[in-house]
Amino acid sequence: MTKNNETGWNLDNSYTTLPQSFYTEIPPTPVSSPELVKLNHSLAISLGLTPEELKKEAEIAIFAGNALPEGAHPLAQAYAGHQFGHFNMLGDGRALLIGEQITPSGERFDIQLKGSGPTPYSRRGDGRAALGPMLREYIISEAMYALDIPTTRSLAVVTTGEATYRETKLPGAILTRVASSHIRVGTFQYAAARGSIEDLKSLADYTIKRHYPEIEAHENRYTALLQEVIKRQASLIAKWQLVGFIHGVMNTDNITISGETIDYGPCAFMDNYNQGTVFSSIDTQGRYAYGNQPYMAAWDLARLAESLIPILHEDEEEALKIAQDEISKFSVQYENHWFLGMKKKLGLFSTEEQDQPLIEQLLKMMEKYKADYTNTFRSLTLDAIENTALFESPEYKDWYKLWQSRLKRQEQSKENAYEMMKNNNPSIIPRNHRVEEALEAAVTNDDYSVMEKLLEALSNPYAYSTDQEEYCIPPAPTNRPYRTFCGT
């Protein structure tokens, strides 16, 4: 671990303590003329880094992969994954972990360069990234952070001065991603597929030490590890559902063991409430539709449980039973998180038998009348009537009376209920059309002011500020569905 005192780099790379089959050491591929286009000042400070130093040419070279900070140990991680249900051996095909930054408070965060060049896992890809998708990940990951949803974060984006070729010629870029770690369900699948129980134990022990040290002394720490990951994912997916976030590519290599949201390729936020909403251009069967996300999370976690079977118990039948028992708990945990979150969105402090039907009735009406998900809860929070089909319907008026009656039966005042709603119903989300508007200005016109204004608004989604109102407006009706792409 080496500290550069001027900038604040304080890097280690504990991942190299794992067997070498889990990674390949490889330097980034230099680029011709890097330019810093976005730096996350507040994140830099929390990591113990000095923003003004990071803007200097020598530090920009680090974000571009043209230089390495003291203590860096670049490597590409190996992992596997079920991609749309099909198992593949994978790995970092266009990203490098350069090290782990130890913060002033002693926390450890991966520093990864995304778009840093080809690796042994590139599978004929160029290892590069385009500017638009990297800025998109920056915007949405920071919006998720502001929404209090566990997520990887974005420290910087640099342009490379080189073209990247996808369907068309695009400006190249590199994103510096920050994560609690990049250990995935797919990392455990990779270990299990290779067949070495010792390697699998090494990975599990490393993961426990890094993310769940409180279970190190547990009688069966590998069962406890599975339990903890299930708990975190149940909470995470409920938080996605509560704000209308659709990940789009919930492959097992995109499910983190830390419980953070990762990979913002084809993700988007729902406008009109619909359980079947899909944005990803490659999800033609709706596998990862909004309403399917809890089920797909359970499916992914079952793949983790399968991978752990060799170390859950020496008797395979008993190990299988343990795995099945633990996975069966996910749905109950998820439902509890979701129900509690929905109650908060409606200002309900206590629990009554009719709360679940009250919630379900509202959601059915929202789907029937194609109501905007975020704005419906925003209007309820403000106790305002919108000029929409939902609010003008007789069903809604009847429902509203039931809801108001329910609020009156609480010990807490209506003012307290509305305050809780305000803290749980975001006034704004990164609406797809506003994100596209910001990306178009930045990528096509080299105008980052639109993105900066959007990021400022998204940084406090529960403020209910008049300055944010323009970002509350849904997109104009269109016959063309919004489509997202993975960026690779």
From Swiss-Prot:
Q: Provide the cofactor list for this protein.
A: Mg(2+); Mn(2+)
Name the catalytic site residues.
253 (proton acceptor)
Which PANTHER family did the record assign? PROTEIN ADENYLYLTRANSFERASE SELO, MITOCHONDRIAL
Entry similarity comment = Belongs to the SELO family.
Name the gene behind this protein. ydiU
Q: Which domain of life is it from?
A: Bacteria
Enzyme Commission numbers on file: 2.7.7.-, 2.7.7.108
- Function recorded in the entry: Nucleotidyltransferase involved in the post-translational modification of proteins. It can catalyze the addition of adenosine monophosphate (AMP) or uridine monophosphate (UMP) to a protein, resulting in modifications known as AMPylation and UMPylation.
Q: Which InterPro entries match?
A: SelO
Ordered alphabetically, the record's keywords are: ATP-binding, Magnesium, Manganese, Metal-binding, Nucleotide-binding, Nucleotidyltransferase, Transferase
Q: Where does ATP bind?
A: 91, 93-94, 114, 126-127, 177, 184, 263
Q: Does the keyword Nucleus apply?
A: no
UniProt-annotated binding residues for Mg(2+): 254, 263
State the organism named in the record: Bacillus cereus (strain G9842)
Which Pfam families does the record match to this protein?
Answer: SelO (PF02696)
Report the enzyme's class at the first EC level. Answer: transferase
Name of the protein = Protein nucleotidyltransferase YdiU
Instruction: Give the catalysed reaction(s), semicolon-separated.
Output: L-seryl-[protein] + ATP = 3-O-(5'-adenylyl)-L-seryl-[protein] + diphosphate; L-threonyl-[protein] + ATP = 3-O-(5'-adenylyl)-L-threonyl-[protein] + diphosphate; L-tyrosyl-[protein] + ATP = O-(5'-adenylyl)-L-tyrosyl-[protein] + diphosphate; L-histidyl-[protein] + UTP = N(tele)-(5'-uridylyl)-L-histidyl-[protein] + diphosphate
